[in-house]
């Protein structure tokens, strides 16, 4: 009964694609976690210097159904490269892409995730690779086309042998929940997560940057009443202004 999404407005209003014609408000917000950042990775000795250099190359795009694959498609199409036409696209999971890049089956891999990502750490420990800059003009086009994306760079030294900041863009990483889930269940679940963030950080690194201060960042749709109740009790900064802005 939970989900992740890129286009919050589309999910909430049910107005586009698979959501068209469905009743609005069935999916609502729960909590915001660490934003995910786009990575475009090539071998260090490759002559690929930019996204546009991927024309005619073999590119790992992520597995079907994953949000990272959607983001990779969006990036490449915005750069003017059509999957299957301008380059050969491979739809596989990140660990498989890491192996394929390392053994020469891919020229590049694209993944949108919360850094530092363990498969990328593994890749850099075994091979010399580079993370490509995504130029400001390209990221600006992406952000203009979809407000779900925001400007965000990969900080220097996120990975070994990465002394410089890498220009990129990011996507708010939010958890959604069905509005039909009982309020008290969501309240208790929210309370359990928020009061055990140290433990959650041992489960996945994305939780290490989660805090009360940023728990509603990136939301433009109503929150589940159970989550809203807890955030009010916990004194989440800006919660009343946010609730008013979405009519809660």
What residues fall within each predicted segment?
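An extracytoplasmic/periplasmic, membrane-proximal ligand-sensing/linker region
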Residues: 96, 113-131, 141-144, 184-248
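Single conserved hydrophobic/aromatic residue that forms the stacking wall/gate
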Residues: 1-8, 12
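Ligand-binding clefts/hinges and TM-proximal coupling segments of bilobed small-molecule sensing domains
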Residues: 64-74, 148-210, 216-219
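Short, solvent-exposed loop/beta-turn-alpha elements that line the ligand-binding surface or hinge
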Residues: 19-24, 217
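Bilobed "Venus flytrap"/periplasmic-binding protein-like clamshell domains
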Residues: 35-103, 213, 217, 221-226
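Pocket-lining segment of extracytoplasmic ligand-binding domains
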Residues: 16-17, 83-181
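Short, solvent-exposed loop/turn segments at the edges of secondary structure
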Residues: 33-37, 169-170
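Short beta-strand-centered segments that line the small-molecule binding cleft or hinge
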Residues: 13, 26-32
């Amino acid at each position: 009964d939970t989900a992740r999404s890129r286009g919050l407005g589309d999910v909430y209003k049910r107005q586009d694609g698979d959501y068209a014609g469905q009743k609005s408000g069935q999916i609502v917000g729960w909590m915001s976690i660490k934003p995910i950042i786009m990575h475009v990775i090539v071998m260090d000795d490759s002559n690929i210097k930019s996204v546009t250099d991927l024309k005619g190359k073999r590119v790992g795009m992520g597995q079907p159904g994953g949000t990272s694959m959607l983001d990779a498609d969006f990036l490449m199409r915005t750069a003017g490269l059509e999957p299957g036409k301008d380059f050969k696209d491979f739809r596989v999971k990140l660990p498989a892409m890491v192996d394929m890049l390392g053994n020469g089956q891919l020229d590049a891999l694209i993944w949108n995730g919360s850094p530092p990502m363990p498969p990328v750490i593994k890749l850099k420990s075994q091979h010399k690779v580079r993370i490509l800059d995504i130029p400001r003009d390209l990221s600006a086009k992406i952000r203009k086309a979809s407000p779900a994306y925001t400007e965000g760079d990969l900080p220097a030294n996120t990975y070994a042998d990465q002394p410089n900041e890498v220009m990129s863009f990011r996507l708010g990483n939010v958890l959604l929940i069905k509005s039909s889930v009982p309020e008290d269940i969501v309240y208790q679940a929210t309370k359990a997560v928020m009061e055990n963030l140290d433990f959650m950080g041992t489960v996945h690194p994305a939780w290490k940057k989660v805090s009360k201060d940023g728990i509603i960042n990136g939301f433009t749709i109503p929150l589940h009443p159970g989550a809203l109740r807890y955030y009010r009790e916990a004194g989440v900064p800006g919660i009343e202004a946010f609730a008013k802005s979405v009519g809660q």
